[in-house]
């Protein structure tokens, strides 16, 4: 029976992480467990940055963006000797189990701690990219989506005023959920998704046809890492003779107070993680599917439960414009 658990956040921060930490801490305390916070992710674990938490440690954090525990990239965790030291540090505090909030890279580290060292670990999906396996939604995605839509709405105002073409680059890496849904909600004329090969010439020809038909402004939503959006803006302006500007939303999408959906989702997942640990389960990741909380073996989720690309949403956007 576990008596002490720890919680850490790893990888890129996401709105709602604090709500998840709060869910873990207060539900664990309710069950009579001692709870410790690991500061600065796996890096902090390796450097023994661990502090005991109480219910007041998480007072008012549900409204705050980011993660008060801090986060850090720590590729050295792939080294078995580094993981062994981390497990030793956890045991030196009497910690039996660990909740890891982050993406699939964070999940893999948690699974290895469970398999190699018997530390019961549960992963919670904390990333704005909505690309974690085994879940319909990740903690932070909905807030980031609202941030992106708000930015698109503001760009629409100025683009229409100046008869300008605006390119907005949205985060997501290799998952375009943010881009596609923000574009649909914001009424963007064009979507460039990472899952579909980018044809620059086709895009420019579409814009030329729209302008010939009387279009006075347009917004292009594009997922990050596909192309240099500032260079793309120059090429479009040269071809269509319309002022074209690129806006990179960047890390502003990670910040801000989490929306109600993310606060509730994160709280539910935090409580569910503690329930799993009390059942003696480790090496699992938590998700929400069809509105129900679920858990999957981490490796099975990573290998077999990748999110499928919803091409029908792109098709729908073409029909709407």
UniProtKB/Swiss-Prot annotation:
<keyword id="KW-0324">Glycolysis</keyword>
<feature type="binding site">
    <location>
        <position position="164"/>
    </location>
    <ligand>
        <name>substrate</name>
    </ligand>
</feature>
<feature type="binding site">
    <location>
        <position position="12"/>
    </location>
    <ligand>
        <name>ATP</name>
    </ligand>
</feature>
<dbReference type="InterPro" id="IPR022953">
    <property type="entry name" value="ATP_PFK"/>
</dbReference>
<dbReference type="GO" id="GO:0006002">
    <property type="term" value="P:fructose 6-phosphate metabolic process"/>
</dbReference>
<dbReference type="GO" id="GO:0030388">
    <property type="term" value="P:fructose 1,6-bisphosphate metabolic process"/>
</dbReference>
<feature type="binding site" description="in other chain">
    <location>
        <begin position="251"/>
        <end position="254"/>
    </location>
    <ligand>
        <name>substrate</name>
    </ligand>
</feature>
<keyword id="KW-0021">Allosteric enzyme</keyword>
<feature type="binding site">
    <location>
        <position position="245"/>
    </location>
    <ligand>
        <name>substrate</name>
    </ligand>
</feature>
<dbReference type="GO" id="GO:0003872">
    <property type="term" value="F:6-phosphofructokinase activity"/>
</dbReference>
<keyword id="KW-0460">Magnesium</keyword>
<feature type="binding site" description="in other chain">
    <location>
        <begin position="171"/>
        <end position="173"/>
    </location>
    <ligand>
        <name>substrate</name>
    </ligand>
</feature>
<feature type="binding site" description="in other chain">
    <location>
        <begin position="215"/>
        <end position="217"/>
    </location>
    <ligand>
        <name>ADP</name>
    </ligand>
</feature>
<dbReference type="GO" id="GO:0070095">
    <property type="term" value="F:fructose-6-phosphate binding"/>
</dbReference>
<keyword id="KW-0547">Nucleotide-binding</keyword>
<feature type="binding site">
    <location>
        <begin position="55"/>
        <end position="60"/>
    </location>
    <ligand>
        <name>ADP</name>
    </ligand>
</feature>
<dbReference type="GO" id="GO:0046872">
    <property type="term" value="F:metal ion binding"/>
</dbReference>
<keyword id="KW-0479">Metal-binding</keyword>
<comment type="pathway">
    <text>Carbohydrate degradation; glycolysis; D-glyceraldehyde 3-phosphate and glycerone phosphate from D-glucose: step 3/4.</text>
</comment>
<dbReference type="GO" id="GO:0016208">
    <property type="term" value="F:AMP binding"/>
</dbReference>
<keyword id="KW-0808">Transferase</keyword>
<protein>
    <recommendedName>
        <fullName>ATP-dependent 6-phosphofructokinase</fullName>
        <ecNumber>2.7.1.11</ecNumber>
    </recommendedName>
</protein>
<dbReference type="GO" id="GO:0042802">
    <property type="term" value="F:identical protein binding"/>
</dbReference>
<feature type="binding site" description="in other chain">
    <location>
        <begin position="127"/>
        <end position="129"/>
    </location>
    <ligand>
        <name>substrate</name>
    </ligand>
</feature>
<comment type="subunit">
    <text>Homotetramer.</text>
</comment>
<feature type="binding site">
    <location>
        <begin position="73"/>
        <end position="74"/>
    </location>
    <ligand>
        <name>ATP</name>
    </ligand>
</feature>
<feature type="binding site" description="in other chain">
    <location>
        <position position="156"/>
    </location>
    <ligand>
        <name>ADP</name>
    </ligand>
</feature>
<dbReference type="InterPro" id="IPR000023">
    <property type="entry name" value="Phosphofructokinase_dom"/>
</dbReference>
<dbReference type="InterPro" id="IPR012828">
    <property type="entry name" value="PFKA_ATP_prok"/>
</dbReference>
<dbReference type="Pfam" id="PF00365">
    <property type="entry name" value="PFK"/>
</dbReference>
<feature type="binding site">
    <location>
        <begin position="103"/>
        <end position="106"/>
    </location>
    <ligand>
        <name>ATP</name>
    </ligand>
</feature>
<comment type="similarity">
    <text>Belongs to the phosphofructokinase type A (PFKA) family. ATP-dependent PFK group I subfamily. Prokaryotic clade 'B1' sub-subfamily.</text>
</comment>
<comment type="function">
    <text>Catalyzes the phosphorylation of D-fructose 6-phosphate to fructose 1,6-bisphosphate by ATP, the first committing step of glycolysis.</text>
</comment>
<feature type="binding site">
    <location>
        <begin position="22"/>
        <end position="26"/>
    </location>
    <ligand>
        <name>ADP</name>
    </ligand>
</feature>
<feature type="binding site">
    <location>
        <position position="104"/>
    </location>
    <ligand>
        <name>Mg(2+)</name>
    </ligand>
</feature>
<keyword id="KW-0067">ATP-binding</keyword>
<dbReference type="InterPro" id="IPR015912">
    <property type="entry name" value="Phosphofructokinase_CS"/>
</dbReference>
<dbReference type="GO" id="GO:0005524">
    <property type="term" value="F:ATP binding"/>
</dbReference>
<feature type="active site" description="Proton acceptor">
    <location>
        <position position="129"/>
    </location>
</feature>
<dbReference type="GO" id="GO:0048029">
    <property type="term" value="F:monosaccharide binding"/>
</dbReference>
<dbReference type="InterPro" id="IPR012003">
    <property type="entry name" value="ATP_PFK_prok-type"/>
</dbReference>
<dbReference type="GO" id="GO:0061621">
    <property type="term" value="P:canonical glycolysis"/>
</dbReference>
